[in-house]
Design a protein with these regions (language model features):
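Serine-hydrolase catalytic machinery in alpha/beta-hydrolase-like enzymes
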Residues: 1-59, 155-157
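Acidic catalytic loop of the alpha/beta-hydrolase fold
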Residues: 119-124, 151
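Short beta-strand/loop motif that positions the catalytic acidic residue
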Residues: 108, 114-116
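Alpha/beta-hydrolase fold nucleophile elbow
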Residues: 61-72
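Gly/Ala-rich beta-loop-alpha elbow adjacent to hydrolase catalytic centers
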Residues: 71-75, 79
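Short alpha-helix in the alpha/beta-hydrolase fold that links the catalytic acid
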Residues: 4, 124-134
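A conserved short beta-strand
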Residues: 88-98
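C-terminal catalytic histidine-bearing segment of alpha/beta-hydrolase fold enzymes
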Residues: 135-183
Length: 183
C-alpha cells in the first residue's frame, strides 16, 4: 500500500494511505497476523474512520479540492463504499473489491473505475448486479476485466498472483482516470 501511495504521489497527486488497523494498534509486521486483525475490525466504525480522511483533506493547502480513492481487495471494497458515502468524491477506483449493496449505488456521485481478475469467481459474482445498478443510475464507470489472472494480480509482493502485464495496464488506466477526473 505504501508503494502504491508513493506511485500516486509520483504521478502528481496528494496521496494518503490511512492505516485501517490503527484503531487496533497498527499493522503487525507478520502478514498472517495482519489478516487476522482485519477480522476484528467493525465495518461501520472502519468506514467512518476512512470517511474522516475526506474531512481532513480540505484543510491541506496543497489540496485542489478534487478527491479520489483507490483500493485493492479489502481496500477495493472500501473504495466502493467510499463512493457511496462520500459525496465530495470525484473518482473511485476499485481493484477486485466487493461491490456495495445495489440499493446504495444511487448515492454514488463519483466516476467509478473497476478492475477485476478473470479467475476471481467469488468477487466477480457481484459484477452483473453492480454494473446494472451503475447503468440504471447513470453513474459514469469503466469496468476492466483481466482474463487469465488471479485476485491480487496487482500485488507485486505476492509472486504467485502478481501479473506484471495486467498490473502495469491497470495502473496506467488508474492514473489516466485520475488525470481525467481529478486534475
Amino acid at each position: 500500500i505504501e508503494d502504491v501511495t508513493r506511485r500516486a504521489a509520483k504521478a502528481g497527486y496528494l496521496a494518503i494511505a490511512p492505516n485501517a488497523l490503527s484503531p487496533l494498534g497498527g499493522t503487525p509486521a507478520n502478514e498472517d497476523e495482519a489478516r487476522t486483525k482485519f477480522q476484528e475490525l467493525k465495518a461501520e466504525d472502519n468506514l467512518k474512520n476512512f470517511i474522516k480522511v475526506f474531512d481532513y483533506l480540505p484543510l491541506r493547502k496543497d489540496s485542489n479540492g478534487k478527491y479520489g480513492c483507490v483500493g485493492f481487495c479489502w481496500g477495493g471494497a472500501m473504495s466502493n463504499n467510499l463512493a457511496v458515502n462520500v459525496p465530495a468524491l470525484k473518482a473511485a477506483v476499485a481493484f477486485y473489491g466487493r461491490q456495495p449493496a445495489v440499493e446504495e449505488v444511487v448515492k454514488i456521485k463519483a466516476a467509478v473505475q473497476l478492475h477485476y481478475a478473470g479467475l476471481d469467481e467469488r468477487v466477480n459474482a457481484g459484477i452483473p448486479a453492480y454494473e446494472e445498478a451503475l447503468k440504471k443510475n447513470d453513474i459514469p464507470y469503466e469496468l476492466h476485466m483481466y482474463e487469465g489472472v488471479n485476485h491480487a494480480f496487482h500485488n507485486d509482493t505476492a509472486p504467485t498472483r502478481y501479473n506484471e502485464v495486467a498490473a502495469k495496464l491497470a495502473w496506467q488506466r488508474t492514473i489516466e482516470f485520475f488525470n481525467e477526473h481529478l486534475k
